[in-house]
Amino acid sequence: MAKLHDYYKDEVVKKLMTEFNYNSVMQVPRVEKITLNMGVGEAIADKKLLDNAAADLAAISGQKPLITKARKSVAGFKIRQGYPIGCKVTLRGERMWEFLERLISIAVPRIRDFRGLSAKSFDGRGNYSMGVREQIIFPEIDYDKVDRVRGLDITITTTAKSDDEGRALLAAFNFPFRK
């Protein structure tokens, strides 16, 4: 079992129960899922780019990504409905906890010119979204085999009812928020 999951059950639950005066342990917010999304707009011209992006995402997440397709045709972007334009992975359970642990302790500190994550990226319901400009911050990606530096979106979905609860949950995991 991931260390972070044990830490959540032993420490974070107690801390949040006292902070927000919950009556039941089930009221304490928890991380539900983590979604990783990589949009590959250049995949229209070169299909190989999407395969490379999917391979990178598979290495980062540990599971095979789903290829996302365009929902509707947009002439300005030269895409048609059904064209593959990106890939995504939804992590739950053990893989989610392991990824979150790697994100906080290894990947985020490796971000170039890092000054902390924005605490304003909550959506109003306790879910946190962040963008990563380079996939090479993850140790699973071999820098020499990267054909192109791509970014990805990371969304952490929680059961929190408000942004304050979600922020307190992630701060309890020592998320490096900007002061």
From Swiss-Prot:
<dbReference type="GO" id="GO:1990904">
    <property type="term" value="C:ribonucleoprotein complex"/>
</dbReference>
<dbReference type="GO" id="GO:0006412">
    <property type="term" value="P:translation"/>
</dbReference>
<comment type="subunit">
    <text>Part of the 50S ribosomal subunit; part of the 5S rRNA/L5/L18/L25 subcomplex. Contacts the 5S rRNA and the P site tRNA. Forms a bridge to the 30S subunit in the 70S ribosome.</text>
</comment>
<protein>
    <recommendedName>
        <fullName>Large ribosomal subunit protein uL5</fullName>
    </recommendedName>
</protein>
<dbReference type="InterPro" id="IPR031309">
    <property type="entry name" value="Ribosomal_uL5_C"/>
</dbReference>
<dbReference type="InterPro" id="IPR020930">
    <property type="entry name" value="Ribosomal_uL5_bac-type"/>
</dbReference>
<keyword id="KW-0687">Ribonucleoprotein</keyword>
<keyword id="KW-0699">rRNA-binding</keyword>
<keyword id="KW-0694">RNA-binding</keyword>
<dbReference type="InterPro" id="IPR031310">
    <property type="entry name" value="Ribosomal_uL5_N"/>
</dbReference>
<keyword id="KW-0689">Ribosomal protein</keyword>
<dbReference type="GO" id="GO:0005840">
    <property type="term" value="C:ribosome"/>
</dbReference>
<dbReference type="GO" id="GO:0000049">
    <property type="term" value="F:tRNA binding"/>
</dbReference>
<dbReference type="InterPro" id="IPR020929">
    <property type="entry name" value="Ribosomal_uL5_CS"/>
</dbReference>
<dbReference type="GO" id="GO:0003735">
    <property type="term" value="F:structural constituent of ribosome"/>
</dbReference>
<dbReference type="GO" id="GO:0019843">
    <property type="term" value="F:rRNA binding"/>
</dbReference>
<comment type="function">
    <text>This is one of the proteins that bind and probably mediate the attachment of the 5S RNA into the large ribosomal subunit, where it forms part of the central protuberance. In the 70S ribosome it contacts protein S13 of the 30S subunit (bridge B1b), connecting the 2 subunits; this bridge is implicated in subunit movement. Contacts the P site tRNA; the 5S rRNA and some of its associated proteins might help stabilize positioning of ribosome-bound tRNAs.</text>
</comment>
<dbReference type="Pfam" id="PF00673">
    <property type="entry name" value="Ribosomal_L5_C"/>
</dbReference>
<dbReference type="Pfam" id="PF00281">
    <property type="entry name" value="Ribosomal_L5"/>
</dbReference>
<dbReference type="InterPro" id="IPR022803">
    <property type="entry name" value="Ribosomal_uL5_dom_sf"/>
</dbReference>
<comment type="similarity">
    <text>Belongs to the universal ribosomal protein uL5 family.</text>
</comment>
<keyword id="KW-0820">tRNA-binding</keyword>
<dbReference type="InterPro" id="IPR002132">
    <property type="entry name" value="Ribosomal_uL5"/>
</dbReference>
